[in-house]
Swiss-Prot record:
Catalyzed reactions per annotation: oxaloacetate + ATP = phosphoenolpyruvate + ADP + CO2
Family of the protein in this entry: Belongs to the phosphoenolpyruvate carboxykinase (ATP) family.
Organism of origin: Brucella melitensis biotype 1 (strain ATCC 23456 / CCUG 17765 / NCTC 10094 / 16M)
Xref: PROSITE patterns: PEPCK_ATP
A Pfam family assignment: PEPCK_ATP
Binding site for ATP: 201, 220, 236-244, 285, 322, 447
EC number: 4.1.1.49
Role: Involved in the gluconeogenesis. Catalyzes the conversion of oxaloacetate (OAA) to phosphoenolpyruvate (PEP) through direct phosphoryl transfer between the nucleoside triphosphate and OAA.
Protein name: Phosphoenolpyruvate carboxykinase (ATP)
GO cellular component terms attached to this protein's record: cytosol
Name of the coding gene: pckA
Keywords of the record: ATP-binding, Cytoplasm, Decarboxylase, Gluconeogenesis, Lyase, Manganese, Metal-binding, Nucleotide-binding
Main location (coarse class): cytoplasm
Cofactor note: Binds 1 Mn(2+) ion per subunit.
Phylogenetic placement of the source organism: Bacteria, Pseudomonadati, Pseudomonadota, Alphaproteobacteria, Hyphomicrobiales
Sequence positions that bind substrate: 61, 195, 201, 322
Length: 536
């Protein structure tokens, strides 16, 4: 077996049971991985030098094909309502078949780190069948120094073999695609999908399981730091503006997607970014756009024209087109991946019902309530071609990656907020003056002005009113922001219609929260929205 590249000889790939391979490439850099990718016909080059790969039928994650091993260790610690169980026997059989399937193949190994905090990191070894997958994950996670590689010992291993097709009957799985996670042994097996995001989220899932037991809060969020060292954390589901609002030229970007919060402050889990590129433009997002124009970046499912120019407006393969690049491709990115204790937490929502104010201040109990709710509303087309808002609740702003019960994360968040006296804000980037179709999108200029006032501390001095439906505090006046948009009801021409829409949304919140009622105390229950009909 031919082995190439720097690695710890005492912790070679054979420690994972992988033997009789034709070749193993350890820790290759971008140039070598480009050469191997092209040699193997896995991807092509854009005119600017980015590596462009297609993932075939899977252009997103396969959450319905993800399984967690249910054993004595995980039995009482995993939220089984949200995680599909796999028996240890089925996993063992699958693992043996993965090892058999790998025989005679060339494999690529990247020895990487999840977590920029030395006390709360995991050494994650990622073994891939595809060379471009090796570059992808090298871009996304934290890369150890060349010296550190010689003594690197993996604590977690991911084996990604897209050509492996799972037999549903043999392993008790759903389809030919499988993502099997053994949290006890820290092994992840990915088969039957070429979508690279599965690898990144497997490390996130492992850290989301490991860290709460150490009192560290794992978060699906972006984070940045102001010139005075004040750290801000941004929670939000897809389409709420998390990436756009945290990419602020006046602040240092700590990371765009996954972070931990512990005794030393906030730290990035990753060493790169995985940004959406559909309709990306140099005007709207210059920093992200610039990364797509250079050597080392991986473009996933981006369409190239005949001159190999990327067409970011073309969603014919998928709307979920992406680019993966190291964090240092962004000019104002943090070199350490670490920030201090957060001064502000921003929970983003895009309320397409037009009911919520553009900003509200939350108490720690309200912050826990809204964190557990994880609300946004997207606009979905109905069969008649009419579009209407659809509420989405994804607990902890990232339900698919949370192995433990949401209340564990919620209680930890609430404790840290109280301990560090963090200001919490709910920011609505959705609609004002009516629901989608009647009202208009919240002006980004207003959102940025409100956010700036929250982050610099001046918003704390504003006069606040209590929202009659949601019970949170809403500023009455903010310099540079039209006062009318601060009171959503006043922006609706039809006040009765607003009250009806507000009642509808409040009822959705209440109904969604029923499953958490028995896991929270009275203070959090009392933070629930309730209809108190406003006077004309």
């Amino acid at each position: 077996m031919k082995e190439t590249g720097i690695h710890n000889k005492a912790a070679s790939i054979s420690t994972s049971g992988l033997k009789e391979l034709s070749a193993v490439f350890y820790n290759l850099g971008p140039a070598r991985l480009y050469e191997e990718t092209i040699r193997r016909g896995e991807a092509e080059l854009s005119a600017q030098g980015a590596l462009v790969a297609r993932t075939g039928q899977h252009t997103g994650r396969s959450p319905k094909d993800k399984f967690v091993v249910r054993d004595a260790n995980t039995e009482d610690h995993v939220w089984w309502d949200n995680n599909k169980p796999m028996t240890p026997e089925a996993f063992e059989l699958l693992y043996a078949d993965f090892i058999e399937h790998a025989k005679g193949r060339e494999l690529f190994v990247q020895d990487l780190i999840g977590g920029a905090d030395a006390d709360n990191k995991i050494n994650a070894r990622v073994i891939t069948e595809y060379a471009w997958h090796s570059l992808f994950i090298r871009n996304l996670l934290i890369r150890p120094s060349q010296e550190a590689l010689a003594s690197y010992v993996p604590e977690m291993t991911i084996i990604d073999l897209p050509s492996f097709k799972a037999d549903p009957e043999r392993y008790g799985v759903r389809t030919e695609t499988v993502i099997a996670v053994d949290l006890t042994r820290k092994i992840v097996l990915i088969g039957g999908t070429s979508y690279a995001g599965e690898m990144k989220k497997s490390v996130f899932t492992a850290l989301n399981y490991i860290l709460p037991a150490k009192g560290v809060m794992p978060m699906h969020c972006s984070a940045n730091e102001g010139p005075n060292g004040d750290t801000a954390v941004f929670f939000g589901l897809s389409g709420t503006g998390k990436t756009t609002l945290s990419a602020d030229p006046t602040r240092t970007l700590i990371g765009d997607d996954e972070h931990g919060w512990g005794e030393h402050g906030v730290f990035n889990f990753e060493g790169g970014c995985y940004a959406k590129t559909i309709r990306l433009s140099a005007e709207a997002e210059p920093e992200i756009y610039a990364t797509t124009q250079r050597f080392g970046t991986v473009l996933e499912n981006v369409v190239l024209d005949e001159n190999r120019q990327p067409d970011f407006d073309d969603g014919s393969l998928t709307e979920n087109t992406r680019c993966a690049y190291p964090l240092d491709f962004i000019p104002n990115a943090s070199k350490s991946g670490k920030g201090g204790q957060p001064k502000n937490i921003i929970m983003l929502t895009a309320d397409a019902f037009g009911v919520m104010p553009p900003i509200a201040k939350l108490t720690p109990a309200q912050a826990m309530y809204h964190f557990l709710s994880g609300y946004t509303a997207k606009v979905a087309a109905t069969e008649k071609g009419v579009t209407e808002p659809e509420a989405t609740f994804s607990t902890c702003f990232g339900a698919p990656f949370m192995p433990r019960h949401p209340s564990e994360y919620g209680n930890l968040l609430r404790k840290l907020i109280a301990e560090h006296k963090v200001d919490c804000w709910l920011v609505n980037t959705g609609w004002t003056g009516g629901a989608y179709g009647v009202g208009k999108r919240m002006p980004i200029k207003a959102t940025r002005a409100l956010l700036a006032a929250a982050l610099d501390g001046s918003l704390n001095n504003a006069e606040f009113r209590i929202d009659p439906n949601f019970g949170f505090a809403v500023p009455v006046e903010v310099p540079g922001v039209e006062s009318s948009i601060l009171d959503p009801r006043s922006t609706w021409a039809d006040k009765v219609a607003y009250d009806a829409q507000a009642k509808k949304l409040v009822d959705m919140f209440v109904s969604n929260f029923e499953k958490f009622e028995s896991h929270v105390d009275h203070e959090v229950k009392d933070a629930a929205p309730a209809i108190r009909m406003a006077a004309e």
